[in-house]
Amino acid sequence: GGMPFWLAMVVVPLAVGTMGLVVERFLIRPLYGRPIDDPLLLTFGLAYVVVELVRIVAGKQGIPVEMPEALQGAVDIGIGFFPIYRLFLIGVAVAVVAGLWLLLERTRYGLIIRAGAQDPLILRVLGVQVARVWLLVFGLGTGLAAMAGFLAAPLQGAAPEMGIPVLAEAFVVTVIGGMGSIMGSILTGLGLGIVEG
């Protein structure tokens, strides 16, 4: 039963990304202009609310997620055997990072996002609808987080609290890597992954 893996890989990020749009519009947006602690605490608190809601709906044990047959097993990469699913994860990660980099560095929309992160007032002066930009950024971020959780599920099961440890790590990566630096965040994330094994 359940939705096929490949379909769910598309549907889950879209559904959660849409929920992210609603959260940004009605919960996060009223806090813009306030100290950064306020939206930060709200999103941390919201994460715990979501965990409890998932526990109520899906149970405390979580749900086992089976990886597709095509991604099971291992392949010889010359220095030993490596799980096919982990190679698939590396491929997806590279594709997502490349897509984000192209979006932020090579498009007008990316220029607006980067400018807004530095000085939102300039964008308002230029007539850019900053609220719409942040709405789409938040939706994209929640969608990508959902994809990461979905892809991790076959390795550890879809448990209600599976995202909580990642919250702290994401915060560390953002702070050390630099708020506006995608390359800094990538390198910090890679470093953290290597340290954790």
Specify the residue positions occupied by each region the protein language model found:
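Helix-boundary and loop/linker segments of multi-pass membrane transporters
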Residues: 2, 33, 81-82, 127, ...
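Transmembrane alpha-helical segments in multi-pass inner-membrane proteins
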Residues: 3-14, 135-145, 149-150, 155-197
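Alpha-helical transmembrane segments within multi-pass membrane transporters and channels
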Residues: 3-46, 53, 187-192, 196
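A helix-boundary/kink motif common to multi-pass secondary transporters
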Residues: 4, 32-36, 118, 129, ...
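Membrane-interface helix caps of multi-pass small-molecule transporters
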Residues: 21-30, 57, 102-106, 151-154, ...
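Transmembrane helix-bundle core of multi-pass membrane transporters
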Residues: 30-31, 36-106, 130-133
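Helix-loop-helix "hairpin" substructures at the membrane interface of multi-pass membrane proteins
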Residues: 80-159, 182-188
